[in-house]
């Protein structure tokens, strides 16, 4: 039976990016293995997966701006924490961390869009990509299960502000609702901590669903996702697709589509969306094997 550790992995470090303090984990030595979370999580999501990679490289996990232990933006409001703003902060942090030229990316949720985008811009620096419950193509509302569709349509309406900023729906309902097991109070409190204050401190959890590429909007994110998926569906870059069963955003036609990507290994593990909280040992072991094969092929 899987043991679900509650303690964070490693010791947080901090760098100032554009006047804001950003938090990250940076443990071990060697070529970088970069774990990137999405909404509404943090590097805490990877706590039970990163130990499986010890000894295989430098393990890096960053907290997006306004999330985890990273600073909030001020002033805040509806125009803050867009995909573009999040990307600018994260890519600047990755640049400052000097990740090297043999990077393995481990991606989830919005971390996948950011990582796929970065990989597309730095193709010669990426050795391989592991991804799970990722943003692999623009979506339509028909791709969403009815039970979830209404909530996300709500986020993209004027009701989004009270839902997210007042009632903290993304943390209190969406997060635990997309995990098969029940998180402990201690685990939930780690995820609550960045958003304990109501109002604008919770803005990132609302801006992210408003940036999802659904039915052609927002156009700039749809264009971005189409740009990186056009590359991913033809590149021989080694890929590990960690398929969640039953899954949430890679299901149906989208699952069929992603299975067409070349030079890709697939495993299936139990999970909905936050699959790291249900199957960390299976995920960690699969990524470790993937990295060993990459390093061996490269003669490292």
Curated annotation (Swiss-Prot):
Q: How is this protein named in the record?
A: Haloalkane dehalogenase
Catalytic residues, per the record, are 109, 133, 273
Which reaction is recorded as catalysed by this protein? 1-haloalkane + H2O = a halide anion + a primary alcohol + H(+)
> Tell me, what is one Gene Ontology molecular-function annotation carried by this entry?
haloalkane dehalogenase activity
**Source organism, top-level taxon:** Bacteria
Q: What is its EC number?
A: 3.8.1.5
* Alphabetic keyword roster: Hydrolase
**NCBIfam families, per the entry:** PRK03592.1
Family classification: Belongs to the haloalkane dehalogenase family. Type 2 subfamily.
Name of the gene: dhaA
